[in-house]
Amino acid sequence: MEAEVTSVLLAAGLSPEDYRPHYRCPLCQDKGYTLSADGRRVRCVCQAVQHADRKNAGVPLCSFAEFDAMAFPAGPQRETALRHRDLLRRYADRFPETDKQNFLLLGPTGLGKSFLLSCVASALRDKRTPVRFVTAYQLNCDFRAQHFGGPDALSALIRVPFLAVDDLGTEPMLRNITIEYLNTLVEERLRRGRHTGVSTNLTPGQL
């Protein structure tokens, strides 16, 4: 059987290696665990590395697997939450070849916007995609520090392949800083084709 498969692959211009799965972690084959000598599951070292990577990028430890549809009332609200989960999971799976480059999560508190944004950032980080997750307040602090001679935070924020900004609109408005720096960040990321996700409690009119 294996010889037949190899023959078909070669005829198609492929090799047996193209047919075999390619794992990011050869130790656990991307399962997240290995088996000890007595058969117990042991957390793979790759999970600790991913945990450290997420922490360094400011990414909360959330995952789509933890999404609990029962947390939402049965009916339209739950259906909407599930639809948003599926859309964002597909966004993360297809990154960077996404249907839309950017996304904005709108709505009042309690709809899971921050959680879903965190799930996207975490999933991308697990794929070794450079990610930055910041709250709007943190972003504003970085802008203010740079404006008064501090480190250049804007350049790194512009370059990162995926930027997640949580709770836009909760930050204080600083004259000549908040709007001006945010506009520069958004315009430069759009110009360079970078992907961005934002969550906010503001309405479209307030934005």
Residue ranges and their predicted role:
Residues F115-R128:
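P-loop NTPase Walker A phosphate-binding motif
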Residues T129-P130, R159-F162, R192-V198:
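Loop/turn-to-beta-strand initiation segments
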Residues A74-R85, R125-V160, P172-N176:
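Short glycine-rich substrate-engagement loop in P-loop NTPases that contacts/grips substrate
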Residues L14-V59:
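Interdomain "pre-motor" coupling segment immediately N-terminal to P-loop NTPase/helicase cores
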Residues E66-F103:
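Pre-Walker A (pre-P-loop) alpha-helix and adjacent loop at the N terminus of AAA/AAA+ ATPase modules
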Residues D99-L116:
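Walker A/P-loop nucleotide-binding motif
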